[in-house]
Amino acid sequence: MKAELIAVGTEILTGQIINTNAQFLSEKCAELGIDVYFHTAVGDNEGRLLSTLEVASKRSNMVVLCGGLGPTEDDLTKQTLATFLGRNLVFDELAMAKLDRFFASRPGRVRTPNNERQAQIVEGSQALQNPAGLAVGGMIEQDGVTYIVLPGPPSELKAMFSESLLPLLSQSQQQLYSRVLRFFGIGESQLVTVLADVIDKQTDPTLAPYAKVGEVTLRLSTKATSQEEANLRLNQLEEDILQHDKLADYFYAYGEDNSLVKTVATRLAEKRQTIAIVEQGTGGLLQAELSLALADQPYFSGGKVVGQLGIESGWLSEEADCIRQELQADLGLAVSVLIKPESTEDNVLAKVYLTLATPSGISQKEIDLRGYSWQYLRQLACLQAWDFVRNTL
């Protein structure tokens, strides 16, 4: 299914409003397995809209028009589509009844013939009721092309799409199912290089890499009629990915909204283990992140933030074990970030020292970070710390 979105309204072309409807509809179409190939904007002009429809009807089999359904003279969308299809405009009974109720409850408002235009649909259309306004939308198929008319105001468009249009589209379309794999410790360019053969031959399912702060995600997507059918394809693609060059070693979790700290929080809760933290050079960011991830779960025993050490070594081995014992936690994490004197504001050279104390002993890791701003480096230091803890749990 090739779709084209046409935004109707001179105010879009003059920059008076931003076309947020295109973003919303593109996202929803993708979820339904509908490929949006074109975004078009056209002013409130019948001739230019007719020309736009002529082009769209030849290159797309779904044309979605947004805007131009109001009561004023420049609201021409339904009238122009009717002309293009060689049909008349007719009144929809439900939309007309809603208009009657609207004016009956507002005796001070004058009802004019223009108001009634909002209750019209193209003859032969399936009406799309508007839960958030008066202008009715519609959907009609002709010559192999489905035309959909939606209102311009985003609140009305979203309500009509969700409540009136989505159930109709879901009946006839394969949906897009996605799975997100999260990786830490490997860059996007390296990941893409390792997966070059998979990326080059992809059709359905597909995969797309996205670089995040300090990590990379892979979105796996497929069109299917059910979650079970989608899982068969996504499972195979995931297996192909993780067997490449030890990529399984970098994979840590699923999910668009997941993170390293959330993964640590989940594992702490699953194992019913507590952790105490002492940090230097991160400004308490570790403790703030874990507190947020755990919410009201009792697995963060507490912690402290210490100032500059004033020594060459950044190891906080004693501090990690002391805070573990002091707060009676299962784990004691100590993180120290030492900034080298030659660093600048936008080119920070640093060493990160990680220490994790447990009842059975102490493990440590040292990491060099360079070339980042101080704010970005703090985030990376925290990510390294959470990955260190994750690999221990």
Swiss-Prot record:
Gene3D superfamilies: 3.30.70.2860, CinA-like, MoaB/Mog-like domain. It comes from the Bacteria. InterPro entries: CinA, CinA-like_C, CinA_C, CinA_KH, Competence-induced_CinA, MoaB/Mog-like_dom_sf, MoaB/Mog_dom. CDD domains: cinA. PANTHER family: NICOTINAMIDE-NUCLEOTIDE AMIDOHYDROLASE PNCC (PTHR13939), NMN AMIDOHYDROLASE-LIKE PROTEIN YFAY (PTHR13939:SF0). Belongs to the CinA family. This is Putative competence-damage inducible protein. The lineage of its organism: Bacteria, Bacillati, Bacillota, Bacilli, Lactobacillales. The gene is cinA.
